[in-house]
Curated annotation (Swiss-Prot):
TM stretches of this protein: none
Amino-acid positions noted as binding substrate in the UniProt annotation, renumbered to this chain: K7, R10, K41, P42, V43, N44, T45, K66, R85
Species for this entry: Cavia porcellus (Guinea pig)
Name the record gives this protein: Ribonuclease pancreatic B
Tagged with keyword Iron: no
Class of enzymatic activity (EC top level): lyase
Tissues in which the protein is found: Pancreas.
Keyword Glycoprotein attributed: yes
Family statement drawn from the similarity comment of this UniProt entry: Belongs to the pancreatic ribonuclease family.
Length: 128
């Protein structure tokens, strides 16, 4: 079975990716990463930084998760991300996404040993 850590990497990591060259990025990636099986995943964020940099966030600023759990961490620095949101006209199995790019601080939930990201919680403006 796929571990939570591996699922996080499949759903959220694309270190080499630079979607700027293609408005089709989300449509291709959501299929390639198996997020359109059974339904169109409504929202997904890809992070274009190294796995080491994203894993390091687990040792950065401890913040509350959206669900109230305490194992979320916010990156000190901005990271390059792409948000993919399903379009309102999208009908499974023809999932269609619109893409927006940003450089924001990311918030991830971490667990396990080694302590690694298992859930992408949010992206926010870095706190000052």
């Amino acid at each position: 079975a796929e571990s939570s850590a591996m699922k996080f990497q499949r759903q959220h990591m694309d270190p080499e990716g630079s979607p700027s060259n293609s408005s089709n990025y989300c449509n291709v990636m959501m299929i390639r990463r198996n997020m359109t099986q059974g339904r169109c995943k409504p929202v997904n964020t890809f992070v274009h930084e190294s796995l080491a940099d994203v894993q390091a966030v687990c040792f950065q600023k401890n913040v509350l998760c959206k669900n109230g759990q305490t194992n979320c961490y916010q990156s000190y620095s901005r990271m390059r991300i792409t948000d993919c949101r399903v379009t309102s006209s999208s009908k499974f199995p023809n999932c269609s996404y619109r893409m927006s790019q940003a450089q924001k601080s990311i918030i991830v939930a971490c667990e396990g040993d080694p302590y690694v990201p298992v859930h992408f919680d949010a992206s926010v403006e870095p706190s000052t």
